[in-house]
C-alpha cells in the first residue's frame, strides 16, 4: 500500500509485495517502509526497492517484525557489492523484537555490510514528526506480524470558497503555503499571486494562512493483514485502528470458509467487517482476497459491508492519499 503524504513529496510504503505496477517516480518518494512479515507476497518487492535506492541520497528506513534483520541480510548478501563504494545508498533496517527495536544500517561506502546501531525501547511508535506518527502493534499469524497505523498530527486544507472570493488563481504556491504552515514557517515572506482578472496581489505567508488555510484533526489510516481471528489479535487490532478514517484490512475468505481461514491464520470478510465496526472506523477497504473467489469478489465485499455497517471501498491498485 503506497501512502502519499500530500504536498510533501514524500510517501510511506506498507509491505513490499510485487512493485512492478507502481511507477518508479512514486517509489523514489518513499522514505519509510513497514513490512508486516516476510511471507513472499509481502516481501518479494524488496530487491526492486533496493535497486531503486542505490543511487539516491535520501536514507530509506525499513521496519519489520522479529527476525527481519536476518531476512534483510540474506537478501543483500545474495549480491556482489565490489563496485558500490561510490554510491550514496543508505538503507536502515530495523526489527521489533519484544520490547526492543534493533537496527543496522547498510551503506555503499561500507560495501553493504550491516553496521549495528544502538538498540532502543519499543514503545508502539516507530516514527514521529510534526506531520505524522507511525504506530505498530505485534499481531499473530502463526509468526509475528505487524499491524500499522499512520496518524496525521493535523490536517491542513484550503478554503476553496474563500480562495475564489479573493480572485486568486490556484497554483504551486498553495502547496508551498500548506508545507510552510505544517512546519510553522508561515511568516512574513511575501508571495506574489496572479488574480483571475489578470492582475496580481501580494501577501505575506502569514496573511494568506489566516485568510484561506483550514485546520482540522489529522486523518488516521490503519492497515491490518494476515491475522487469525483470536480474542488477543482482535483486541490489539481494534485498539490500533480505533477511530481510523480508513481501515485497510484483509478479507481473505468468505465466512462460509471460516474453518479454512482459521487453519491458515487469516480473516474472513465478515470478521474484517466486525473488526472495523468494533474499532469505530469510518471506512473499510477489504483487500488480500483469496484467488479461490475469482469472479466472486463482490460477494466478499458485500459480506464485509454487511458486518461493518458502513462504507466499504476498493482501493486503487497501489495507493492511498493522506
What role is predicted for each listed range?
Residues 30, 55-60, 218-219, 279-286:
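Short, surface-exposed connector motifs at secondary-structure boundaries
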Residues 14-16, 31-41, 65, 222-228, ...:
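Active-site neighborhood of phospho(di)ester-bond hydrolases with catalytic His/Asp-centered motifs
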Amino acid at each position: 500500500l503506497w501512502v502519499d503524504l500530500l504536498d510533501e513529496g514524500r510517501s510511506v510504503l506498507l509491505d513490499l509485495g510485487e512493485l512492478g505496477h507502481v511507477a518508479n517516480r512514486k517509489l523514489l518518494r518513499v522514505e519509510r517502509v513497514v513490512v508486516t512479515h516476510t511471507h513472499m507476497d509481502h516481501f518479494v518487492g524488496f530487491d526492486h526497492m533496493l535497486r531503486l535506492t542505490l543511487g539516491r541520497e535520501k536514507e530509506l528506513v525499513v521496519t519489520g517484525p522479529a527476525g527481519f534483520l536476518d531476512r534483510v541480510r540474506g537478501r543483500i548478501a545474495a549480491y556482489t557489492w565490489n563496485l558500490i563504494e561510490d554510491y550514496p545508498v543508505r538503507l536502515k533496517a530495523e526489527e521489533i523484537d519484544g520490547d526492543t527495536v534493533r537496527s543496522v544500517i547498510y551503506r555503499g561506502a561500507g560495501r553493504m555490510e550491516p553496521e549495528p546501531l544502538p538498540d532502543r525501547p519499543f514503545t508502539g511508535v516507530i516514527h514521529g514528526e510534526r506531520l505524522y506518527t507511525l504506530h505498530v502493534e505485534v499481531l499473530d499469524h502463526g509468526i509475528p506480524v505487524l499491524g500499522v497505523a499512520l496518524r496525521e498530527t493535523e490536517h491542513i486544507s484550503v478554503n476553496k470558497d474563500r480562495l475564489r472570493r479573493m480572485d486568486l488563481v490556484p497554483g504551486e504556491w498553495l502547496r508551498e503555503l500548506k508545507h510552510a504552515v505544517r512546519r510553522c514557517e508561515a511568516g512574513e515572506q511575501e508571495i506574489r499571486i496572479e488574480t483571475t482578472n489578470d492582475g496580481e496581489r501580494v501577501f505575506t505567508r502569514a496573511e494568506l494562512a489566516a485568510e484561506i488555510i483550514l485546520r482540522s484533526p489529522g486523518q488516521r489510516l490503519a492497515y491490518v493483514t494476515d491475522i487469525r481471528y483470536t480474542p488477543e489479535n482482535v483486541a490489539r487490532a481494534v485498539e490500533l485502528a480505533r477511530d481510523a478514517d480508513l481501515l485497510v484490512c484483509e478479507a481473505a475468505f468468505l465466512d462460509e470458509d471460516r474453518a479454512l481461514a482459521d487453519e491458515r491464520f487469516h480473516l474472513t470478510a465478515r470478521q474484517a467487517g466486525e473488526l472495523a465496526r468494533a474499532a469505530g472506523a469510518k471506512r473499510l477497504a477489504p483487500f488480500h482476497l483469496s484467488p479461490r473467489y475469482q469472479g466472486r469478489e463482490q460477494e466478499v465485499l458485500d459480506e464485509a459491508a454487511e458486518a461493518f455497517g458502513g462504507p466499504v471501498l476498493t482501493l486503487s491498485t497501489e495507493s492511498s492519499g493522506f
